From Swiss-Prot:
Residues 1-111, 141-272, 777-840, 854-1028 are annotated as: Disordered. One of its GO terms (biological process) is RNA processing. CDD domains: cwf21_SR140, RRM_SR140. It comes from Pongo abelii (Sumatran orangutan). The lineage of its organism: Eukaryota, Metazoa, Chordata, Craniata, Vertebrata. Belongs to the splicing factor SR family. The modification Phosphothreonine is found at residues 718, 930. The modification N-acetylalanine is found at residue 2. Residues 92-121, 192-232, 779-809, 836-914 form a coiled coil. SURP motif repeats lie at residues 429-472. Residues 7-16, 169-178 have a biased composition (Polar residues). InterPro entries: CID_dom, ENTH_VHS, mRNA_splic_Cwf21_dom, Nucleotide-bd_a/b_plait_sf, RBD_domain_sf, RRM_dom, SR-CTD_assoc_factor, SR140_cwf21. This is U2 snRNP-associated SURP motif-containing protein. Its main location: nucleus. PANTHER family: RNA PROCESSING PROTEIN LD23810P, U2 SNRNP-ASSOCIATED SURP MOTIF-CONTAINING PROTEIN.
């Protein structure tokens, strides 16, 4: 059992084989003798161990024997067993038990396993020719050969062999050492083997011949391809022989597969002009490819491999080929377009296999087309062009020569440019005409001209200035000079003596590629400007802005794109500003774009190249952005929607304020623009001084230099009495709650001003009284009464509180404000402030009514008018309310005018009566002196003095009011007080009588008395002043 494994020793296997062969006859005889006796024995009395032992020996012999002698002995045993089993089945059919059946099955299984094992061993041994299989590239040949034939053809046909092939035939063992029975068996093979062997051999020869034929066809095909692509004569056979001699063993293996090798990225052929395109947008067609690739040169062919199956369509990208007329143009296209984004697809280019190039391209770039067009008319014979005009077509025309010599000189230096006609019918007619003229002579040309004088196709024979005639004349001359119809000389020459130079067309201008001038023209658009986006980047930005939503991821992706292209920050800012200026954009997109601006500004301080440019460029555009947002905010019809939009914009302002991106005044300005409080157009008109930008030159005025003129007032040496924000010392002394005695005594002792007094320090009494008389307190009360009557009842208490607070604030303001300005504008300011407050209150009422009306419209409580939008209907309602308010205002003014007239009339009557009844000063003194009893004088005083004393009290109160409002004349206030004290006998009663005189007025209202009673310290001050 030593030779079961392939790695076993060869000597042991040979010994066992020889012993098996010599003892085979005895073993067979023993099997013949013992077989029937054993089988006839009953199963109960049959000894089991010898049977098992004999069976094992038999199986061992069968497994070890692999010679053909065993194949002859095996059919004998099978026949004997078959006959024996038949006899047994016929005689003792019923005596078979389950164990016997199992043993028979085991025997059959073991025999089958032994046969499989023999085949396995025969596969590793070359002695058995029936099992040899050979492999040839391109097909399988089952050649059953003898050993000597396989040895002869071992190197020619591929045959797999194990690593122990060298040890298969050891030197000490030859074919003679084998047993004679084995040799006899080999000679007794059937004659069919020879026929099969001859048939296999012929197939192999035929296969070899077929391979040679394929190789020859392949070489011929490569030669024809190279000749067509380069317009060259066929290559010599030496090149093909040299190729066939290189690496014969490798060529034998791969020659059949070479034609099917992929060539999309093959750079082995240096003459190919075909480019492979591996990633094309499915929406791109051949015309687009021509426009994209045609910028680099004329194209020979363009092809897109359109998808045919569902699998190819699922890839969502196409591939194709673009062939140029010239290798240099193809190299430039590969260099400039590889990796470029075209219609959002990255171009992946490579070299493809060479294709036949046609004589005429399918696409000619416009820059090259211009050079192949005929020149403009010049007026010279044969449309000759001056050299300067030929180099620069835009050069101005030279003036016509004055004499013949100048004309001849210009003509001799001019160049006649020959251009091949592009119309194929005309070109064929010219060639046919030249053919007959060369054959028949000039008489044929004259006859044709006479016959076809009215035929437009033969116009080239008569019009000498046309490009067709120039080509006809040159082609005829070239053929007569011996040039070939397909090859001609391209040097400049003179056709006529002292005539112009003729410049023939190039042989094939499309094979030479584009000139350097044309290349520069084609690449004018190619280099991208620094700080500008490319076309595909601009398209991507616009696509991002169109699809932007207020989602975190979308805004983050857009912000990353902006920062990655920060070198083009200005263009990106302009694009975003433009997108925010469209009113029809939905509100969520507007909010998303504003959030994008906020994100970019927040990240403008990040460590990214050129990111800080966004802060600079957005600063110049934010005013426009928020003006457009204000326009959008005004067009929103729904109240809740507009408030939501406003809230989102205001959150951006709060975030920017926290980030400190821009100064706070600038953010307040932007907020006012958004709310509509400031208009950009008005600001631009008022702004005369340009903005101070980084890098702008600073003007000559620096800190420390004297300024000549500020606000139009020249600065003198005189000190400024009043500065905004600086409290005046004289005002600081007079505070609420401080007794006036101590303060005024201190004022007398202290010097008031250390400099020369101004004209405002001393005020004439007459001017002060005149100013006091101009404003009447009763008129102010009337205005307040009328405004309060017209206000809504729901807001009466609020308006009263507002007026009280305003009155107290106005008093405090008068105490601390500038006396110089307030004395001049006191009366006007009081009326204006009260009127403005009235107007504001009325406008608030109108806006409340309008908002209520708008809510009712939106909720459906009020019907919508056909043909009007919500906004138009609301505006119409607002105009109605304003019109009503104007009408009421006019009625009030009329009533006021009537009341003013009545007041003036009543005052004039009272003054006349007073003048009549008031006695002179002397008469009063006489009465006081001559009165015997105080009771009479007192009674007379009580009867006669009410009107003058009430008038005096009114005037004194007006003067006190003026003095309290203007504290600039503190020196005069005690003087006035003392004078008034002299006029009135009892100073303590004057305020009480003035209060009675106020109560006697018919227009006194309870509201005003309430407001007067709420400031008791003021009346206290007045009483103390009167005491002084």
């Amino acid at each position: 059992m030593a030779d079961k494994t392939p790695g076993g020793s060869q000597k042991a296997s040979s010994k066992t084989r020889s012993s098996d062969v010599h003892s085979s006859g005895s073993s067979d005889a023993h099997m013949d003798a013992s077989g029937p006796s054993d089988s006839d024995m009953p199963s109960r009395t049959r000894p089991k161990s010898p049977r098992k032992h004999n069976y094992r020996n038999e199986s061992a012999r069968e497994s070890l024997c692999d010679s053909p002698h065993q194949n002859l002995s095996r059919p004998l045993l099978e026949n004997k067993l078959k006959a024996f089993s038949i006899g047994k089945m016929s005689t003792a059919k019923r005596t078979l038990s389950k164990k016997e059946q199992e043993e028979l099955k085991k025997k059959e299984d073991e025999k089958a396993a032994a046969e499989i094992y023999e085949e396995f061993l025969a596969a590793f041994e070359g002695s058995d020719g029936n099992k040899v299989k050979t492999f040839v590239r391109g097909g399988v040949v089952n050649a059953a050969k003898e050993e000597h034939e396989t040895d002869e053809k071992r190197g020619k046909i591929y045959k797999p062999s194990s690593r122990f092939a060298d040890q298969k035939n050891p030197p000490n063992q030859s074919s003679n050492e084998r047993p004679p029975s084995l040799l006899v068996i080999e000679t007794k093979k059937p004659p069919l083997k020879k026929g099969e062997k001859e048939k296999k051999k012929s197939n192999l020869e035929l296969f070899k011949e077929e391979l040679k034929q394929i190789q020859e066809e392949r070489d011929e095909r490569h030669k024809t391809k190279g000749r067509l692509s380069r317009f060259e004569p066929p290559q010599s056979d030496s090149d093909g022989q040299r190729r066939s001699m290189d690496a014969p063993s490798r060529r034998n293996r791969s020659s059949v597969l070479d034609d099917y090798a992929p060539g999309s990225h093959d750079v082995g052929d240096p003459s190919t002009t075909n480019l492979y395109l591996g990633n094309i947008n499915p929406q791109m067609n051949e015309e687009m490819l021509c426009q994209e690739f045609g910028r680099f040169g004329p194209l020979a062919s363009v092809k897109i491999m359109w998808p045919r199956t569902d699998e190819e369509r699922a890839r969502e990208r196409n591939c194709g080929f673009v062939a140029f007329m010239n290798r240099r143009d193809a190299e430039r296209a590969l260099k400039n377009l590889n990796g470029k984004m075209i219609m959002s697809f990255e171009m992946k280019l490579g070299w493809g296999k060479a294709v036949p190039i046609p004589p005429h391209p399918i696409y000619i770039p416009p820059s090259m087309m211009e050079h192949t067009l005929p020149p403009p008319p010049s007026g010279l014979p044969f449309n000759a062009q001056p050299r300067e005009r030929l180099k620069n077509p835009n050069a101005p025309m030279l003036p016509p020569p004055k004499n013949k010599e100048d004309f001849e000189k210009t003509l001799s230096q001019a160049i006649v440019k020959v251009v091949i006609p592009t119309e194929r019918n005309l070109l064929a007619l010219i060639h046919r005409m030249i053919e007959f003229v060369v054959r028949e002579g000039p008489m044929f040309e004259a006859m044709i001209m006479n016959r076809e004088i009215n035929n437009p196709m033969f116009r080239f024979l008569f019009e000498n200035q046309t490009p067709a005639h120039v080509y006809y004349r040159w082609k005829l001359y070239s053929i007569l000079q011996g040039d070939s119809p397909t090859k001609w000389r391209t040097e400049d020459f003179r056709m006529f003596k002292n005539g112009s130079f003729w410049r023939p067309p190039p042989l094939n201008p499309y094979l030479h590629g584009m000139s350097e001038e044309q290349e520069t023209e084609a690449f004018v658009e190619e280099p991208s400007k620094k700080g500008a986006l490319k076309e595909e980047q601009r398209d991507k930005l616009e696509e991002i802005l169109r699809g932007l939503t207020p989602r975190k991821n979308d805004i983050g992706d857009a912000m990353v794109f902006c920062l990655n292209n920060a070198e083009a920050a200005e263009e990106i800012v302009d694009c975003i500003t433009e997108s925010l200026s469209i009113l029809k954009t939905p509100l969520p997109k507007k909010i998303a774009r504003l959030y994008l601006v906020s994100d970019v500004l927040y990240n403008s301080s990040a460590k990214v190249a050129n990111a800080s440019y966004y802060r600079k460029f957005f600063e110049t555009k934010l005013c426009q952005i928020f003006s457009d947002l204000n326009a959008t905010y005004r067009t929103i019809q729904g109240h809740l929607q507009s408030e939501n939009f406003k809230q989102r914009v205001m959150t951006c302002f709060r975030a920017w304020e926290d980030w400190a991106i821009y100064p706070e005044p600038f953010l307040i300005k932007l907020q006012n623009i958004f709310l509509g409080l400031v208009n950009i157009i008005e600001e631009k008109e008022t702004e005369d001084v340009p903005d101070d930008l980084d890098g702008a030159p600073i003007e000559e005025e620096l800190d420390g230099a004297p300024l000549e003129d500020v606000d139009g007032i020249p600065i003198d040496a005189t000190p400024i009495d009043d500065l905004d924000g600086v409290p005046i010392k004289s005002l600081d002394d007079d505070l609420d709650g401080v007794p006036l005695d101590a303060t005024e005594d201190s004022k007398k002792n202290e010097p008031i001003f250390k400099v020369a007094p101004s004209k405002w320090e001393a005020v004439d009494e007459s001017e002060l009284e005149a100013q006091a008389v101009t404003t009447s307190k009763w008129e102010l009360f009337d205005q307040h009464e009328e405004s309060e009557e017209e206000e809504n009842q729901n807001q009466e208490e609020e308006s009263e509180d507002e007026e009280d607070t305003q009155s107290s604030k106005s008093e405090e303001h008068h105490l601390y404000s500038n006396p110089i300005k307030e004395e001049m504008t006191e009366s006007k300011f009081s009326k204006y402030s009260e009127m403005s407050e009235e107007k504001r209150a009325k406008l608030r009422e109108i806006e409340l009514k309008v908002m209520k009306f708008q809510d009712e419209l939106e909720s459906g409580k009020r019907p919508k008018k056909p043909g009007q939008s919500f906004q138009e209907q609301v505006e119409h309602y607002r105009d109605k309310l304003l019109q009503r308010e104007k009408e009421k205002e006019l009625e009030r003014e009329r009533e006021r005018d009537k009341k003013d007239k009545e007041k003036l009339e009543s005052r004039s009557k009272d003054e006349k009566e007073k003048d009549e009844c008031t006695p002179t000063r002397k008469e009063r003194k006489r009465r006081h002196s001559t009165s015997p009893s105080p009771s009479r004088s007192s009674s007379g005083r009580r009867v006669k003095s009410p009107s003058p004393k009430s008038e005096r009290s009114e005037r004194s109160e007006r003067s006190h009011k003026e003095s309290s409002r203007s504290r600039s004349s503190h020196k005069d206030s005690p003087r006035d007080v003392s004078k008034k004290a002299k006029r009135s006998p009892s100073g303590s009663r004057t305020p009480k009588r003035s209060r009675r005189s106020r109560s006697r007025s018919p227009k006194k209202s309870g509201k005003k008395s309430r407001s007067q009673s709420r400031s008791p310290h003021r009346s206290h001050k007045k009483s103390k002043k009167n005491k002084h």
